[in-house]
Amino acid sequence: MLFLACECPYLDELDRAQLRKTTSSHLTADMLTGLWQCYYPMYVGNVEFKEVRMFSSGKADIIMEDVGGSAYYAETFKWRWDGNYITFTKGNTTYQFQVTDCIFPELFLSDSRRKYPWAWRRPEDCIK
């Protein structure tokens, strides 16, 4: 994936914010809305999370791929932030990740299996 420079009014603020290390207790749901993408393969159960778009309405679209690459698809989940954990639920399926570190706009998540680095991805109108 290639990111090129673009003119977005809040990019300077994001650049300054990126230098600020914070704890999960300083994160708000508003800071979590938007499009997130995993730096490295994020295998959760039998799927790989590719990216997650979290909406302020409490819904999240998760783009995932079956392990082995046999299917690539998106599913809509409900999401919530309790100050320590991001939880995605759909029917009987629940994914829960603890925010172990944050250097905004980067998040580091973990579950019982491993740690996952995520990074903020710019809005589509800033991606060329």
Where are the predicted features?
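Lipid interaction determinants
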Residues: E7-A74, R80-K128
